[in-house]
Amino acid sequence: MSHCPKLYFISFADSRMSAATDRIREQARDMDVFDEIHVLNEDSLDDAFCQTWKEIMKYGSRGYGYWCWKPYVILRLMEKMPDNAVLLYCDAGCHLNPKGKKRLMDYVESVMSSSIGVKAFYTFFKQYDVIERRWTKGDVFDYFKCRDRKDITDSKQIATTQIFLRKCPSSMRFLREWNNIWYENFSLIDDSPSKSPNFPDFVENRHDQSIFSIMYKLYDIQPLPSGETDVADYSNMDEFPIWDVRDRGYKDTRFVARVKRWLKARKILLRIRYLRIKERIEKFLVKK
């Protein structure tokens, strides 16, 4: 990369996760690449925003209000950044690894060369495939008029756990479109039942991530390499800068997080197997 852009870092979690936000702030400093580091909590949000979402933005709610704050805090900072500056958003549960600085700069170079100025990773779990149609409600596919596009429905979902953005007109348009969904059609975000049919193997909606993922594919953006943030095997992660640990700062976090991930994966696998068996039975009955 001939010229290193100005680099920004941002993360957010409510104040119950102060241990996680303190940790990721220090890790961002230890990376020694960011010109500005912004680690926020609910006190960082504007009064008008809090008033708008006060009914859902409560402690214990999913994503502290279905992650309504995520596109908002990213967009708010991007609007203040100079053109062509690069922002890395990470969930506060991530860990940053200074040994992976070289690979981090590869990601920066990738978003610098992107015509859209947005880069993210596929969602990656070794236990099961995170295929879009299983993790996005039917209404979202119909809203974006892509229900019949197998390149979207049958491909892996794009994660919003880590996002690289370069400030340019196309990335700002992307962010505003993503953010506006909360205001224009909140039922696409939440856990309310889909009005239109879900796919037969649907498991659950992934809220902000479902919207982001569909948009990412419609914008025809190439994802970053899959599996470079997964921490199933720490021994192979030294060269990678961002670890998807889900370390929320609670006591015995690493062990508890692993147990929770295992239990959730098992529940999801059982749900997927049930749907597959149901589909086979229905096909058999139709043939008879």
Residue ranges and their predicted role:
Residues 1-288:
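Glycosyltransferase catalytic domains, chiefly GT-A lineage
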